[in-house]
From Swiss-Prot:
PROSITE patterns: MFS
Protein name as it appears in the record: Probable sugar efflux transporter
HAMAP family, per database record: MFS_SotB
One Gene Ontology MF term: transmembrane transporter activity
Annotated transmembrane regions: 16-36, 51-71, 82-102, 110-130, 138-158, 170-190, 210-230, 247-267, 277-297, 300-320, 338-358, 361-381
InterPro entries linked: MFS (IPR011701), MFS_dom (IPR020846), MFS_Efflux_Transporters (IPR050189), MFS_trans_sf (IPR036259), Sugar_effux_transptr_put (IPR023495)
PANTHER family cross-referenced by the UniProt entry: PURINE EFFLUX PUMP PBUE (PTHR43124), SUGAR EFFLUX TRANSPORTER (PTHR43124:SF4)
Assigned keywords, A-Z: Cell inner membrane, Cell membrane, Membrane, Sugar transport, Transmembrane, Transmembrane helix, Transport
Matches recorded under Gene3D superfamilies: MFS general substrate transporter like domains
Cellular location(s): Cell inner membrane
Annotated family: Belongs to the major facilitator superfamily. SotB (TC 2.A.1.2) family.
Species this chain originates from: Helicobacter pylori (strain ATCC 700392 / 26695) (Campylobacter pylori)
Primary residence: membrane
C-alpha cells in the first residue's frame, strides 16, 4: 500500500514538472523578443520601438483569442488539446527561424500566440488536477517557478544564443526544446477529460461577481504599467544606463532569479494574508520603475531594483491568478481565460504605451510612466479591498 502511495506521489510530481517545463518554454518565447529587440531591429533595419510593437500584437492576439478559443475547445480532452497546441507552437517557431522579413516573423508570432491563448487558459486548473493530494497550492507555485525560470535561463540563454549565432537560432532552439517537452507530455500525462471548464453561459455569471471583475481590471492596470517599462528594459540598460551587453544579460538573469524568490514567498506567505501580500508585491513592482532613471548609472542600485522588481511581478502574477481561481471554482477555465486575456491586454497596452513614450518623450521616461500606471493600480487595489473586505 505504501509503495502504491509513493508511486502515485512520484507520477503526480512528474506531471506537475511537465507543466512547469511547459510554462518555462511558453514564457521564454513570449518574452524573448525583449532580450533580442535590438538584434531583430538591426537585422530588419528598423527601430527598436517599432519592432517592440511585435510584443503588443502578440499580446493582443492572446487577449482577444483566450476566451473564444477556450470556449471552442472546451469539450476537447485536455491531453490531446495540449499536444495539438505544442504542434502549432513548434511549427510556428520553425517559421520564426526562417522569417525572411519582419511581417513573416510577425505572422509566425501570431501562430505562437494562438497556442499561448489556449495553453494559459487551461493550465492552472490542470496542474491543480494532476498534483499530489494536499499539494495544490505548491503545484501552482511550481507552475510559477517554470515561468520564473524562463526569465532566469530562457531569456539570458536566448540572448546569448542570439549574440553567438543570431536571433533566428534562438527561435529554432526554443522549437527544439518544445519538441522534447511535447514528448514528455505524451508519455507522462494521463487521459484528462475536460472538467469544470465552463461554457459561454458562464461568462455573464462571472461578470456578476464584482470583486472578480475588479481583479481583472487591476491586472490590466498593473501589467500595463509593468510592460511600459519592461518591454524596453534591454535598450534602456544599453542606451540610457550605458552598461555593457554582458551586464544587460546578467541583469535579465537577475530579474528571472528574483522570480524564484517570488514563487517561494507566495508559497509561504500568500495564504496567511492574501490582500497584504498582493499589495506588497505591487509596491515591489512600482518603486523600481519610478526610480530606474534616477539611479540609472549606479550599477549595483540598478541590479537591486531589477531584483526587487522581479520578486514583485512574479509574486503578483501568481497571487492574482490564485485569487481568480478562488473566486470562480465553478468555471475555472473560463475565469483563467479571462485572466489570461486581461494580462495580455496589459502586456500589449504596456508595450504600446512604452513605444509612444519613447517616440514622444524619450527612452529615459519609460520608468516614470510605467510606475505612474502602477500607482493608479495600487489605488484601485485599495478601493476594491475596502469595498469587498468580506469577500
Amino acid at each position: 500500500m505504501m509503495i502504491t502511495k509513493q508511486s502515485y506521489q512520484k507520477f503526480a510530481l512528474m506531471r506537475v514538472f511537465v507543466f512547469s517545463l511547459s510554462a518555462f518554454i511558453f514564457n521564454t518565447t513570449e518574452f524573448v523578443p525583449v532580450a533580442l529587440l535590438s538584434d531583430i531591429a538591426k537585422s530588419f533595419e528598423m527601430e527598436s520601438a517599432t519592432v517592440g510593437l511585435m510584443i503588443t500584437a502578440y499580446a493582443w492576439v492572446v487577449s482577444l483569442g483566450s476566451l473564444p478559443l477556450m470556449l471552442l475547445s472546451a469539450k476537447i480532452e485536455r491531453k490531446r488539446l495540449l499536444l495539438f497546441l505544442f504542434a502549432l507552437f513548434i511549427l510556428s517557431h520553425i517559421l520564426s527561424a526562417l522569417a525572411w522579413n519582419f511581417w513573416v516573423l510577425l505572422l509566425s508570432r501570431m501562430g505562437i500566440a494562438f497556442a499561448h491563448s489556449i495553453f494559459w487558459s487551461i493550465t492552472a486548473s490542470l496542474v491543480i488536477r494532476v498534483a499530489p493530494r494536499n499539494k495544490k497550492q505548491q503545484a501552482l507555485g511550481l507552475l510559477a517557478l517554470g515561468s520564473s525560470l524562463a526569465m532566469i535561463l530562457g531569456l539570458p540563454l536566448g540572448r546569448i544564443i542570439g549574440q553567438i549565432l543570431d536571433w533566428r537560432s534562438t527561435f529554432g532552439v526554443i522549437g527544439g526544446v518544445a519538441t522534447l517537452i511535447a514528448l514528455l507530455m505524451w508519455k507522462l500525462l494521463p487521459h484528462l477529460p475536460s472538467r469544470n471548464a465552463g461554457t459561454l453561459a458562464s461568462v455573464p455569471v462571472l461578470m456578476k461577481r464584482p470583486l472578480l471583475m475588479g481583479i481583472y481590471l487591476l491586472v490590466i492596470m498593473v501589467i500595463s504599467g509593468h510592460f511600459t517599462t519592461y518591454s524596453y528594459i534591454e535598450p534602456f540598460i544599453i542606451q540610457i544606463s550605458q552598461f555593457s551587453p554582458d551586464i544587460t544579460t546578467l541583469m535579465l538573469f537577475v530579474f528571472g532569479l528574483a522570480g524564484v524568490v517570488g514563487s517561494f514567498l507566495f508559497g509561504r506567505l500568500y495564504a496567511k494574508n492574501s490582500r497584504k501580500f498582493i499589495a506588497f508585491a505591487m509596491v515591489l513592482v512600482i518603486c523600481p520603475q519610478l526610480l530606474l532613471f534616477v539611479f540609472k548609472n549606479l550599477e549595483w542600485v540598478v541590479f537591486l531594483q531589477i531584483f526587487l522588481w522581479g520578486i514583485g511581478i512574479t509574486s503578483l502574477g501568481i497571487s492574482l491568478q490564485m485569487r481568480v481561481l478562488q473566486l470562480a471554482p465553478d468555471a475555472t477555465d473560463v475565469a483563467s481565460a479571462i485572466y489570461s486575456g486581461s494580462y495580455n491586454v496589459g502586456i500589449g497596452s504596456g508595450a504600446l504605451f512604452g513605444s509612444i513614450v519613447i517616440h514622444q518623450l524619450g527612452l529615459g521616461y519609460i520608468g516614470f510612466v510605467g510606475g505612474a500606471l502602477g500607482l493608479l493600480a495600487l489605488f484601485w487595489l485599495r478601493f476594491i479591498t475596502i469595498k469587498f473586505k468580506k469577500t
